[in-house]
From Swiss-Prot:
Coiled coil: none annotated. It comes from Bacillus velezensis (strain DSM 23117 / BGSC 10A6 / LMG 26770 / FZB42). Transmembrane segments: none annotated. Belongs to the UPF0302 family. HAMAP family: UPF0302. Pfam families: IDEAL, UPF0302. The lineage of its organism: Bacteria, Bacillati, Bacillota, Bacilli, Bacillales. InterPro entries: IDEAL_dom, UPF0302, UPF0302_N, UPF0302_N_sf, Virus_scaffolding_prot_C. This is UPF0302 protein RBAM_020740. It comes from the Bacteria.
Length: 179
């Protein structure tokens, strides 16, 4: 599950997310667009759960959920001021930034599962039941695998439609490696 997520995968996910959901605070859209426009920043972005445990974390929520609209955590300080967080992001480009997105169907979204990383800053005693944690990781791995397979099949179909033999063969090899 700890396969690094590429900058392009993160950008594709943000584009998909912004096209399908409306964030409660417009500043969140500005922050995500700013991050997307700088590859060096995107390398430092990690989509996680429970970002409040991270040294530098942002929580953003959409209109379709009953969660806080926006929170920025830095060390032990929390603010709801999006402009302060934007300023911090610009000034500290070399620091990792952990983003938690709260939106409807987040846990059943293969798009989100494909970029979601394990939060390395979670307290060790947070999970009471190791069996539940293991089951959750297996479900997430299955969702990621299913998403990757479906995306490859779609891309293979498009390559066939274009009569692009080289791309078809490349994607077919990738699909065979998945299975």
């Amino acid at each position: 599950m700890q396969t690094p997520v590429s900058v392009n995968e993160k950008k594709d996910f943000i584009r998909w997310f912004l096209n399908h959901y409306q964030l409660k605070r417009r500043e969140c859209v500005w922050i995500l667009n700013y991050l997307m426009s700088h590859d060096s920043l995107m390398e430092k972005v990690h989509f996680v759960e429970q970002a409040e445990f991270c040294p530098r974390g942002i929580i953003m929520s959409t209109h379709c959920v009953d969660e806080v609209p926006f929170r920025f955590y830095k060390e032990n300080v929390m603010t709801t001021d999006a402009e302060k967080s934007f300023h911090d992001i610009r000034l500290n480009k070399q620091q990792d930034l952990f983003i938690q997105l709260n939106f409807r169907s987040a846990y059943s979204s293969p798009e989100y599962a494909a970029v979601l990383e394990s939060n390395p800053h979670l307290p060790k005693d947070l999970f009471e039941n190791k069996q539940d944690q293991g089951m959750a990781e297996k479900i997430l791995e299955h969702a990621i695998s299913t998403f990757q397979r479906e995306k490859l099949l779609k891309d293979i179909d498009e390559a066939l439609d274009r009569h692009d033999k080289e791309t078809f063969e490349k994607l077919s090899r990738q699909l065979n490696q998945l299975t």
